[in-house]
């Protein structure tokens, strides 16, 4: 418990690797009921990837995810932990150099032949250069060739990985739902049907109940007068409000917002922020990736600053934003003013 608030989500040592790129580096975060957590940081810092890992839209490479006492995901060690990355990177760089060298050599002879087709020896050179290039291409560097399989197998025996099945994934995503930057609405359907469909697919609600709930939340976000409009007839701000209503309609415990205002025209930003402020005042738990520093400072009860796949600083919004400790956060904030 934190200030008598219930711990509902515990994220421990979440990491995400793409080949040699480590997008997330062992991130941990506890989320309590009623929290409004603003995640800030420069582009490419891993914020959106982290958000997608929280409800397993993106499967982490390792780490654990515990929602209301139930572990939905847990991998303590992964293959990447047993790969000799130094040797792999060195050999991969050599491979790239060789690939470029043989490709350039082939291009030189091909260009010479275009300029002077009378030189019959060029055909032979082209054939040999293409063979050399193809030979390199056939033998790409595979990082699994650098895996210490013996140590990895020992680790597997000692570990007890937990990977959710489809039923558990749907269960988790109905409780931790995402509002996407791109809205993810169906343009060929009207507003009301968009909100109804999500309930029928995820919660298996009957049409009458789903319609009643949809109207309730569309009214909450002040879209009751646009229920019969098609999505492509709406402004960006209106689309985002529909996306929020759709998320609320499946009764989630936590709503994840991925830069909810970044795709909007400036005059539409305030209408979406007002809806989010209202949700915060009603105690809805939210995790928001945002560039809106006023929202982070004045609405959130916790700010998390991410950079290069790490949580660099976190804490009370006014303290973090007004008195940044790290040079990286100081530099970031200086560019947002």
Language-model segment annotations:
Residues 230-234, 238:
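Conserved ABC ATPase signature
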Residues 314-315:
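ABC ATPase "signature
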